[in-house]
Amino acid sequence: MRAVRASLVFVALLLAVSACAGDGRPVDLANVTSVERPTPVGAEENPPASSGTSAPAPDCDPKASFRPDGALPPAGQMPPRTTMRAIQDRGQLIAGVDQNTFLFGFRNPTTNALEGFDIDIVRQIAKAIFGDPNKVQFKVVTSAGRIKALQEGDVDVVVRTMTATCERWKDINFSAIYYTAGQRLLVDRGSEVTSLDQLGGQKVCAAKGSTSIKTIAANPAKLIPVQVDNWSDCLIMLQQGQVAAVSTDDTILAGMVAQDPNLTMAGPRFTEEPYGIGIPKANVDMVKFVNGVLVKTINDGTWAKSYDKWLGQTGGSRPAPPTPVYRD
Ligand code: GLU
């Protein structure tokens, strides 16, 4: 009896094998269109409004920073008892940056080095302190992690497409503005959508902790905000058809368009996003120093060179660098 069963199993196996071998075509193909596409880790739909401190942001001019104190000290000779001297003595500037935003802060896949407009700014600060633009320890921070990294003293500066807002000024200081971006919309090429108002009931992606996600959530058309940890997660969700659009700064969206010609920016800018360098609240001396570095970077043509290198490839003409505004 056992022998009969064994030979039946053998015959069944033979039939199964011949089903594949037959005329050379595989059988029983899995229905690949039904495979579920993975959602980026941490993606959240309709997130609760950010907890934050409940007090409203005080009225302020978020673009106004602290005036530099005269000429910059020579590199390698930071004045005693200053934040800059402590950084010089440590031997490295510690900078919070992004590694997922092509053109501003991204990892070059062939060299593994961090590159982009924001990374160039970090190197200018290091050059002013040490005379060497490479004396930097980069720490990758998410949009949502920027303020905490500064408050906990994990980094000396955050240079990460960060909009200076009155709400953020409550917790940290900002340098003068080094770039002015604006929020726009990214959609599939061929889409008719040109504004957030047309996306009622649809999913729109932005990073957690960004000004962009708040603007999406506040739109009266009642969109479904989808928040993720990294901008590259939004790009993937749009490419996989999991969201109808991405909406954030035109700078970040330009980097996505450069990576995927099937996408396009639609409609005009609908916010102003002035970028400042984040600095811990206590380090006003560092803010003044960094503002001196920004003036030098703009005046000696370094800003324009960096703009041409990273944003020149996105078309359009180079804007004038922002004019610094100070509090006094
Ligand atoms: N500039 C916006 C912000 O600071 C969006 C960019 C980002 O989060 O990286 O929130």
Residues of each region from the PLM?
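C-terminal motif of bacterial Sec signal peptides marking the signal peptidase cleavage site
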Residues: 14-19
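Extended ligand-binding regions for polar small-molecule ligands
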Residues: 43-78, 210, 277-315
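Acidic, polar ligand-binding/catalytic clefts
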Residues: 127, 134-198
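Bilobed "Venus flytrap"/periplasmic-binding protein-like clamshell domains
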Residues: 102, 114-129, 162-165, 181-235, ...
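Bacterial signal peptide processing site
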Residues: 20-24
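A ligand-binding cleft/hinge motif common to bilobed small-molecule-binding domains
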Residues: 161-170, 239-272
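Periplasmic-binding protein-like
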Residues: 179-187, 254-291, 314-328
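Extracytoplasmic small-molecule ligand-binding "clamshell" domains
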Residues: 32-158
